[in-house]
A protein has these predicted regions:
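Flexible "arm" and connector segments at domain edges
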Residues: 1-61, 65-109
Length: 109
């Protein structure tokens, strides 16, 4: 498999879910997955705020990415297509400065 392929990454995460029987043991429960993603985001935040090495940050981001791919599997949606649909919407938006920082979102004051 091509390690740069979305399908290869998704297949690896699916194999991990299957190996540990996530579907039958609560590992695919969406509320649980949200809690795990929040935990990983906290670890990413700690890497940034504590000035940890780039490798530590990369590992935590990979953990979050794996959880996101697993959530797409659990919730049965096509993350690849959803990504491209969302990018198309984002590309159509105008950027603006808010509190001295660029935003390209539907941020409202």
């Amino acid at each position: 498999m091509n390690p740069d392929s979305y399908r290869a990454m998704l297949a690896a995460v699916q194999a991990f879910h299957d190996k540990h029987n996530f579907k039958a043991t609560g590992g695919e429960e969406l509320a649980y997955r949200v809690a795990l993603m929040a935990e990983e985001l906290g670890e990413i935040s700690a890497c940034v705020t504590k000035g940890k090495p780039k490798e530590a940050l990369a590992e935590e981001v990979a953990d979050l990415f794996i959880l996101i791919l697993g959530t797409a599997i659990s919730a049965e949606f096509d993350l690849n297509q959803t990504f491209w649909d969302k990018m198309q919407k984002l590309e159509a938006r105008q950027s603006r400065m808010i509190n001295g920082r660029i935003r390209v979102s539907e941020f409202r004051d």
